[in-house]
Amino acid sequence: MASSPDPPSPLLVRLRESIPKAHRKLEIYFQSRASGGGECSVQPVGPSAPDTYEVKFLKKADKEKVLKKSEHEMLVHNKPVTIVLETTKKPVEDLRPRLPSLTQPVETPSSRPPSLTGSLDEALCDDIHPQDGLVSNSVDSVVQKIFLAVTAELNCDLLSKEQRASITTVCPHIIKSMEGSDGIKKVCGNFKDIEKIHHFLSEQLLEREQKRKGSEQKRKCAPQKHTPPDVEREPPDQSSIQVPVLLLEYFKHVNPGRLEFIEYKFGVNIEIQASSPNMVTVGFTSSPFGNVEEASQSFVRDFQKCSQSLKQDCISLEEHQRAKEVRQELSRCFPKLLIKGQGRTLTLLGSPADISAATEKVSQGLGLRPVKITASGYTTGIEVDSTRFKLLEPELLQEISEIEQKFNTRGKVQEKGQKTCILFVPKDKDLDLSVQSYTGFTDAFQRATWQLRTEVLSLKGLGKERARLHNTKFADNFKKEHPNVHFVTSQESVTLTGLPHHLAQAMQYVSKRMGLAPSSGEKLAMDQETPMEISSSDPHGDQQENAALPAPRGTSSSPAASKGTEDYCVICMDTISNKHVLPKCKHEFCTSCISKAMLIKPVCPVCLTSYGIQKGNQPEGTMSYSTQKGSLPGYEGCGTIVINYEIKDGIQTKEHPNPGKAYHGTRRTAYLPDNTEGRKVLDLLHEAFKHRLTFTIGYSRATGVSDVITWNDIHHKTSKFGGPANFGYPDPDYLKRVKEELKAKGIE
C-alpha cells in the first residue's frame, strides 16, 4: 500500500531588518541551492511577531538540510540580509496568530523565555494550561475594579471609517469622545468594553489579511519547483509612472513631503529613477499590507492638479554672480516658483501670474540690485547765501524734512560765515539717493525765493520817531521778534524783506511803534544811491563788507525807487535780462534761461505748469488692447482691459545711446480696470505711446545689459494679482499715480 505524503514541516525564521516583499524573497531563497532547502511556501506570522515568517517545506528532509547550515543570508538590492532560524521545542499545530488580550499578564524579565521561539510557542499554540485561565480571570476582576473608565485612540490610517463606525453596534453604550468628518477617532468606556472592541477590530483586520493572502495564492502560476532556483523573481505587486523630470521637481518643490505621505498612507515604497535625459520613472512597490493601485492613483491626481497651466521662461543675465543674486531674490518673493540656474541663465517654472511678475521684477530691477548713483558734483553739499537762507529758513527746513523722508537721506545745515551749506547723506549705504535730494532742495529754494516780497515805509514827516528808529535797541528788538524779516533803514525810508506772512507781521510791528504807513501799489526798486544789501554783521546795513542780495520781487515800493526796477530770475539766480513771461502762470525768466529749460522739460520751473507734451525716443512699435469679462482685485463689478505692446528688433538711430547698434524687441502686457477712470487712463497711455514716451533704449539695472528696451518712467500693471510688490492688483492708488506721471510729461 502506498505511503501517504509527509505533512508540511514548518520552520520559523526571523529577519534582522524589515524589507519590502520579504516573504517572496524568503520563498525564493529557501528553494535555492544556496539554502539547501527545497519546495516550500512562506507566510508572515502576523502583527504579533514582526519580521517573523513561517516556512512550510513539503519535505521534512529539506527542512533538516536547512537546519544543518548554521548561517543563512540573502542579497537584497546588493545588500546582505541575515536570516535567523528559530528552532521549536514542540510541534506547532496551529500557526495562526492569537488575538492579543489586554488582560494577559505582563511578562517580566525574569519570566521571559530565553529565546524568541518560546514566546512564539506561547503566542501561537492553542494549548493553554488550566492554571493560566485562573490567573487571567483573577486579573480581569482586579483590573475591572482598578480602571473605572478607559479612553482609547483609534488608528485611523489602519481602520476604515466604516470599521470604526461598527463599534457602536458591538458596544452600543460606548462613549465617542472624539468624532470628526472622517469618523470616530477616540472612544471611552469600561475596561471590558475597550477589550471587546479590541478583539472585534483585530478579527476584522485578520479577515482582511486572510482574504488578501487567498487572492495572492490564486494568482500564483506554475508550480514553484519548475522555477529556476537561483533567479530572484520580480514581485508582481508594483507599478511605475513616467513623468518629465522638471515637472516632478516642481511637484516636490510646491508639495514638500507629499511623496512621503503617500508612502505612509498606502503602505508603499516610492523609488525615482532616471529613464531618459528629460524623463524619470516613479516606481511604487507594495509592503505586506500596502495598496499600490490606490497609491499610484493618488499620486497621479496630485501631480495633474499641480502641473496643469504651468508656464516656463528663461532669463539671461550678464554674469554668474548676478544670476545667483537674482535667483535668491526671486525665490524669496515667489516661493511657489521653481528656479533652476545654469551659469548665467535662469529657468523659471510656475503659474503664468508668477512668471509674469518675476520677469517684470527682473526687467525693472526693483529690489534686486542696490541702486548706486554717483553724486560727484555734490560731495561738499550746496552753498547758499546765509542771509537769504535765514529769510526762507522755516519753509526750507520743512522742505528738507520732506526730502529726508522721500529719499531716505539725512539733511545737515551748516552755517559758514556768509554762506550756509546744505548736505544730504544717505541713510542706507546700498541706496544713495542724495542726488535726488539736492535736486529737490534746489527746486524748493527757487520756489521759496520767488515768494520773497519787499515793503518800503517812508520816514518823511517824522521827527523824534526817526531818531528812535535808528536806535540800536529798536533794531535788536525787531530782530528778536521777527528773525525771518530783513530790516534796513535810511534817512528817508525803512525797507523790510521777507515772505508774505512774515512781512505782514513785521510791518504791523513797525507801524504800531512808529506810527508809519506803508506806501502801496508800486514795486520796490534798488535805490541807485543806496543799494539794498544784507549784511551779516551790521544790523542797519551800513558801510561794511556785505553779502549782496539780488532784489526779490516786490509788492510795493516808493515812487523814487520805481525807475530802477529789476526783477529776479529763479533759474540763473540773477537779475532778469531780456524778460520772458510764461502765458499760463505769468512767471518771468530770462529768455535764454527759460528757452534752455523748456528744451529739457516743457514745464514752468516754479509751478510745474505744463507748456507742451514731451517727445521721447521710443523705437517703432504697436499698441493694441482688448477686453475681458473677468475683474481685477479691487475693481469687482467691471471687466478688464488688456494692453499689448510690441516693439520689434531694430537698429538704434542718432537719438539713441549707440547709433547703428542693434537692439532686441520686446512684448509687454498690462492690465487696467474696464471702468470710466480705467478707460481715461487707457486714452492717456495711448497718447503717451503716440509721442514715443512709453519705452526707451538704455541700460537695464536689473540685468546689467545695455541697449535693451526698458520702461520710460510710466508705470504699468503687468500682472493681475500680487499687489504693488508684484506689479499687480489690488492697488487703489495706481490710476491716480499713473495720471500724475503722465501729467508730468505733458499728457492730461
UniProtKB/Swiss-Prot annotation:
Residues with N-acetylalanine modification: 2
One annotated GO biological process: protein transport
Catalysed reaction equations from the record: S-ubiquitinyl-[E2 ubiquitin-conjugating enzyme]-L-cysteine + [acceptor protein]-L-lysine = [E2 ubiquitin-conjugating enzyme]-L-cysteine + N(6)-ubiquitinyl-[acceptor protein]-L-lysine
Signal peptide range in chain numbering: none
Modified residue annotations for Phosphoserine: 9, 215, 536
Compositionally skewed regions (Polar residues) per UniProt: 101-117
Database matches in PANTHER family: DELTEX-RELATED
Quaternary assembly: Homodimer and heterodimer. Can heterodimerize with DTX1, enhancing its ubiquitin ligase activity in vitro. Interacts (via N-terminus) with ADP ribosyltransferase PARP9/BAL1 (via PARP catalytic domain) forming a stable complex; the interaction is required to activate PARP9 but is dispensable for DTX3L catalytic activity. Forms a complex with STAT1 and PARP9 independently of IFNB1 or IFNG-mediated STAT1 'Tyr-701' phosphorylation. Found in a complex with PARP9, STAT1 and H2BC9. Found in a complex with E3 ligase ITCH and ESCRT-0 components HGS and STAM.
This protein's name: E3 ubiquitin-protein ligase DTX3L
